[in-house]
């Protein structure tokens, strides 16, 4: 398979899990494309079928904050089309799952699938911000597959967002 993985590249659980998963998938023969604003810190040595695609964010005087989510969606489109990805696996609902949803709607490859892995604060803290609630719910429901790293997180997601979609548990 050709798999695009998006994660936060910084120190922390979700970035570690995503990077180690990508490395294992590459060792097993899959082609893995990391799409992020910086190289994941755990991606320290060369593995033949791992590629990195940097998301550039531009600043524009009219807007106070850079458009990371939109820049990410654009880069996901570019990589998905050029590399003919089968799957975008995103770690974190906000903003990664929203960006993946946009990319999936834009690309010409209608077979592209999106899997979202929920890690914790994207659901229990950030996602509970009232302005993000509808986005989190929508991005989860629009994903082709959803995983959570614990039963607790799965239950929180189902009750906080009234999700009807199946959420698989893959402990980290």
What are these regions, as identified by a protein language model?
Residues 8, 118-121, 171-172:
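Histidine-centered beta-alpha loop that forms part of the nucleotide-sugar donor binding/catalytic region
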Residues 61-87, 97-102, 130-134, 138:
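An amphipathic, basic-hydrophobic alpha-helix
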Residues 4-11, 23-68, 167:
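N-terminal strand-loop element at the rim of the active site
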Residues 3, 87, 102-124, 147:
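Active-site proximal beta-strand in glycosyltransferases
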Residues 154-172:
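Helix-loop-beta element that forms the nucleotide-linked donor phosphate-binding surface
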Residues 141-150:
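A short beta-strand/loop micro-motif in the catalytic core of glycosyltransferases
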Residues 108-115, 121-141, 155:
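Nucleotide-sugar donor phosphate/pyrophosphate-binding loop at the beta->alpha transition
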Residues 40, 95, 152-154:
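Alpha-helix capping/helix-boundary segments
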């Amino acid at each position: 398979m050709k798999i695009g993985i998006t994660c936060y590249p910084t120190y922390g659980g979700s970035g570690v899990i995503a990077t180690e998963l990508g490395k294992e998938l590459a060792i097993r023969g899959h082609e893995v494309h990391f799409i992020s604003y910086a190289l994941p810190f755990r991606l320290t040595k060369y593995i033949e079928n791992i590629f990195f695609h940097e998301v550039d964010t531009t600043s524009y005087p009219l807007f106070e904050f850079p458009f990371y989510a939109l820049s990410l969606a654009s880069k996901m489109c570019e990589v998905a089309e050029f590399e003919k990805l089968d799957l975008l696996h995103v770690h974190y609902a906000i903003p990664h799952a929203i960006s993946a949803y946009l990319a999936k709607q834009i690309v010409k490859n209608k077979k592209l699938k999106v899997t979202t892995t929920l890690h914790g604060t994207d659901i229990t803290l950030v996602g509970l911000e009232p302005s993000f609630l509808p986005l989190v719910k929508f991005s989860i429901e629009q994903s082709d597959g959803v995983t959570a790293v614990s039963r607790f997180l799965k239950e929180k997601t189902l009750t906080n967002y009234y999700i009807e979609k199946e959420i698989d548990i893959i402990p980290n």
